Every structure is written in structure tokens, then in C-alpha cells.
């Protein structure tokens, strides 16, 4: 399998991207990576490592789309950007998937423009697998692809999300919930009430009902559906709360020698907690509904996050994910 990696995008690129690619090669049998970006810089980074040269390619791209760029304008004007070239490689069947840490809006625009949607899909959604108490994983979508949504979009997100969990996680009859401010059918705004009515009638899903944000990590449901505006706020709020909790724990530990001693006793447990809750453990988010694989890794991804994003992309390829999803969506 061959994956195009945007080597120049992200807070720590190209150091993190090149290192992550090398680490992925060590763990994923049969993987080949195309490092896309400024060839000279990539070659300098590669000198740090020993690797199978048959499994790494370099595709030169002289431009980089940065976080401050206007997404649509950047896609149109920076045609030779590392991000655009990655998507081109997938479009031209020279790679089976693309992974980028870059500007989300630009990546979505480039992916939609060049890869198109699966026939029958109204809008793609950003889908991310979150940890939960039962260690089964809960899929959240949409986390930012569509700030303005319609009930029919969310209804389709539910179908795609359910199919995702069937294919990717092996779940039978995944439970799908609608994020809302209360569990009752009458709760919420016009969008959630109309969406609820559609989800009740959707024969392709096992509809759980409404779910409040306080219960989304319990593991009682497999898929949580919301609009992109709400979903993006949910994602960033959860990340912020996680960072804050670890910050105050660290501050508390440093207050006295007794607390420092206590910290040593729970060091192993704290490492497990951090590993379970860090975004880097869960690889990339997929633009669900596109006709090819395009994954978005976090902008501040370190090498481990890059490695895990490549692992997720590899699993999608191995499972023939797009074709399996297409079977469901094209008959709707």
C-alpha cells in the first residue's frame, strides 16, 4: 500500500512528519510512503535515519499552505503546495490515501474539489474516533466540515457513521445517537428536532435517541452525530479541558515533597491516562463521504501522531473502506 504524506504541513514539520513516516515503516508491513514537499529539506531530514529506500519516495512540491492562508484561495493559487500535490497523487491513483496536518479548510476544499464525493453523498463530514469508558471507541461526526447543516445532512452522517463502525471497528448494529441538550424527543432547536424525526425512520441505523454531552464518553453509543459548528466546538473544548486538567494536576504535584512522592506512586497510571486521552493516539480524522481517502492529522502532531495517522490510513486501505461505504451510500 502507498500513502502520500504532506511532509511540510504542521507545527513540527518536516521533523515530525519524516520521523513519523520512518516509525510507521517499522510497524506497518507492506507500507510505502511518498513524502511530499521541498525535496532538499526532506532529504536532509532523511539523513538522520536508516530505512529501506524502496519504501520511501520523495515528490517535490515547492509551496506550503499555512494555517493563516484563506482555504479556497490557497487551494487555487498554491497548486504546487505539498497538500495539493498529496491530493493529486490520490486522484491520479499514484497513492491510495493522503495524510496531512495542514490547514483543515484548505485540505477539505482540495479534497472535495479533486476527489469528489461518493455518488449519493450530500456532504462529507469530518469523523474522529474518541476514547470512551468501555475502551470501545465512539465515532463523532461532523467535527467541522459543515458549519451550516440541514437535517438530511445529519441523517446521512448517521448512516455513514454507522457503516464506519461496522467496517472499521467490526461493530454489529452500532448504536447511533444525536447530540442534544436533553434526551427527550422534543428537546433542542429546529435542526435537532427535524433530524430526530428522520433518524427515527432511518432503517440503516440502530437509533439510540438523543444524548447529552455529559454522557458521550460513557460508551453506551457507538456513533454521535451533530452539525459541524457544534462538533468543532465540542472537539476543541474537550481538548482544552484535557490540557487544563493535566496542567492543574502537574501544578498540584509540584506543591510539596509529599505530593511529589505520591506522584511517583501513580506515575504509571497517569501515563496510561495521558496515552488514552491524547489526540496523537487516535491518528487522523477522515473526510467521510469522499470517493478516495483523505485524512487530517492534528496541526501539532508529533512523530507518534503521524505514525498513528499512517496506521489508520493503512487500516482503511486494508479494509477496502471506501468501496464498502460506497455500497451503502450509492443505493440510498
Swiss-Prot record:
Enzyme kind, highest EC tier: transferase
Pfam families, per the entry: FA_synthesis
Lipid biosynthesis keyword on record: yes
GO biological process, one term: phospholipid biosynthetic process
Protein's cellular compartments: Cytoplasm
Reactions catalysed: a fatty acyl-[ACP] + phosphate = an acyl phosphate + holo-[ACP]
Keywords: Cytoplasm, Lipid biosynthesis, Lipid metabolism, Phospholipid biosynthesis, Phospholipid metabolism, Transferase
SUPFAM superfamilies documented for this protein: Isocitrate/Isopropylmalate dehydrogenase-like
GO cellular component: a single term: cytoplasm
PANTHER family: FATTY ACID/PHOSPHOLIPID SYNTHESIS PROTEIN PLSX, PHOSPHATE ACYLTRANSFERASE
Role noted for this protein: Catalyzes the reversible formation of acyl-phosphate (acyl-PO(4)) from acyl-[acyl-carrier-protein] (acyl-ACP). This enzyme utilizes acyl-ACP as fatty acyl donor, but not acyl-CoA.
Family: Belongs to the PlsX family.
Protein name: Phosphate acyltransferase
Protein source organism: Fusobacterium nucleatum subsp. nucleatum (strain ATCC 25586 / DSM 15643 / BCRC 10681 / CIP 101130 / JCM 8532 / KCTC 2640 / LMG 13131 / VPI 4355)
Record gene name: plsX
Amino acid at each position: 500500500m502507498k500513502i502520500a504524506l504532506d511532509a511540510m504541513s504542521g507545527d513540527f514539520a518536516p521533523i515530525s512528519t519524516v520521523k513519523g513516516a520512518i516509525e510507521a515503516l517499522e510497524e506497518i508491513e507492506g507500507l510505502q510512503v511518498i513524502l511530499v514537499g521541498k525535496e532538499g529539506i526532506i532529504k536532509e531530514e532523511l539523513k538522520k535515519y536508516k530505512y529501506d529506500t524502496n519504501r520511501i519516495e520523495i515528490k517535490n512540491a515547492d509551496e506550503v499552505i499555512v494555517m493563516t492562508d484563506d482555504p479556497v484561495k490557497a487551494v487555487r493559487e498554491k497548486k504546487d503546495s505539498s497538500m495539493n500535490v498529496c491530493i493529486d497523487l490520490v486522484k491520479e491513483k499514484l497513492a491510495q490515501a493522503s495524510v496531512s496536518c495542514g490547514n483543515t479548510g484548505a485540505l477539505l476544499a482540495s479534497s472535495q474539489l479533486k476527489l469528489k464525493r461518493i455518488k449519493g453523498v450530500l456532504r462529507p463530514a469530518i469523523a474522529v474516533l474518541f476514547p470512551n469508558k468501555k475502551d470501545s471507541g465512539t465515532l463523532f461526526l461532523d467535527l467541522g466540515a459543515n458549519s451550516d447543516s440541514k437535517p438530511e445532512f445529519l441523517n446521512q452522517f448517521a448512516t455513514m457513521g454507522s457503516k464506519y463502525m461496522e467496517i472499521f471497528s467490526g461493530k454489529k448494529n452500532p448504536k447511533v445517537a444525536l447530540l442534544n441538550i436533553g434526551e427527550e424527543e422534543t428537546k433542542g432547536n429546529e435542526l435537532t428536532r427535524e433530524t430526530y424525526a428522520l433518524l427515527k425512520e432511518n432503517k440503516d441505523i440502530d437509533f439510540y435517541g438523543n444524548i447529552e454531552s455529559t454522557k458521550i464518553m460513557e460508551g453506551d453509543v457507538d456513533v454521535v452525530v451533530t452539525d459541524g459548528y457544534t462538533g468543532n466546538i465540542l472537539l476543541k473544548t474537550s481538548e482544552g479541558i484535557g490540557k487544563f486538567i493535566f496542567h492543574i494536576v502537574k501544578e498540584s504535584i509540584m506543591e510539596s515533597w509529599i505530593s511529589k512522592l505520591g506522584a511517583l506512586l501513580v506515575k504509571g497510571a497517569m501515563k496510561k491516562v495521558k496515552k488514552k486521552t491524547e489526540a496523537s493516539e487516535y491518528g487522523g480524522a477522515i473526510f467521510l463521504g469522499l470517493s478516495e481517502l483523505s485524512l487530517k492529522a492534528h496541526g501539532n502532531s508529533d512523530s507518534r501522531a503521524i505514525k498513528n495517522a499512517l496506521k489508520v490510513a493503512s487500516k482503511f486501505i486494508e479494509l477496502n473502506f471506501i468501496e464498502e461505504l460506497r455500497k451503502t451510500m450509492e443505493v440510498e
